[in-house]
Amino acid sequence: MTNSSSQLAQLKQMTTVVADTGDIEAIAKFQPQDATTNPSLLLKAASLPNYQGLVKDSVAWAKTQSDNAEQQVIDAADKISVLIGLEILKIVPGRISTEVDARLSFDTSASITKAHKLIAMYNEAGISNDRILIKLASTWEGIKAAEQLEQEGINCNLTLLFSFAQARACAEAGAYLISPFVGRILDWYKKDTGRNDYASNEDPGVVSVTSIFNYYKLQGFNTVVMGASFRNIGEILELAGCDRLTISPQLMEELANSTDTVIQKLTACEATAEKEAALSQAEFRWQMNEDPMATEKLAEGIRNFTIDQVKLEKQLTDLL
């Protein structure tokens, strides 16, 4: 059965579609509500020809902030993430997610300090807090940083989320939004089991996000569920109806080119469950330790974001 409108247009009727890219042209093409960036996407964007002016501007700005070479690199990296965010905000009507340096993932106070710095840079450019999400890894320390930032009126996007324990702790901390990963969970199970083909509705990443979504709605948590890290459009279509989905330009293109009917799979139920006592740090760490997939994928995600952050800083160092 086909529909006269594209799958992307149909999906937008039931889910807020977010662009998972730093590429302005791709964002302009697909007209998402919001956009998300991360160190890997920023590295990619900073290599694009049309961003070289921004790269130079960030380096020039960093030189005015400090005489210390190491500090200049850090400042330039923060500035480029904000400058790219500002360009994206000219196109999207909603929010930009900008990530805190992954090397701070186990340091609550340093994460809060970095978040304040990023927010101040956006504010100085005339952007109010309600258009920004600060991205933090869903470590215990990242979740605690988000808890404090939310109390200050700074909304957070908790990323690298692979487990129910992480999702529960984020909601209990009052996080504005979580980004539970789908494709990376599938990657782990494929490697672990040697099984290569999963029907979309049996995809372990899809199952994980579905259970988190249903739990949040049942418990009456306001934290937004934004599925992330997709490997194919089958995963996306199985999560139609999720609060938000952040999708790469390549997969948005596939959805835009298909007119097959999109069926809403997730629907918010009435909140009927009594809230449980909040997870303690000990319970959180124990549950994470019991989940090898989440433990390995969280650690790997932090390492990989750090690798790309360092590559970006190397590019900037060469210009300083």
UniProtKB/Swiss-Prot annotation:
Transaldolase is important for the balance of metabolites in the pentose-phosphate pathway. GO terms for cellular component: cytosol. The lineage of its organism: Bacteria, Pseudomonadati, Pseudomonadota, Gammaproteobacteria, Alteromonadales. GO terms for molecular function: transaldolase activity. Belongs to the transaldolase family. Type 1 subfamily. It catalyses: D-sedoheptulose 7-phosphate + D-glyceraldehyde 3-phosphate = D-erythrose 4-phosphate + beta-D-fructose 6-phosphate. Its main location: cytoplasm. This is Transaldolase. The keyword Electron transport does not apply. The active site is at K135. GO terms for biological process: carbohydrate metabolic process; pentose-phosphate shunt. HAMAP family: Transaldolase_1 (MF_00492). It holds the Pfam family TAL_FSA. It is found in: Cytoplasm. Homodimer. Pathway: Carbohydrate degradation; pentose phosphate pathway; D-glyceraldehyde 3-phosphate and beta-D-fructose 6-phosphate from D-ribose 5-phosphate and D-xylulose 5-phosphate (non-oxidative stage): step 2/3. Its EC number is 2.2.1.2. Keywords: Cytoplasm, Pentose shunt, Schiff base, Transferase.
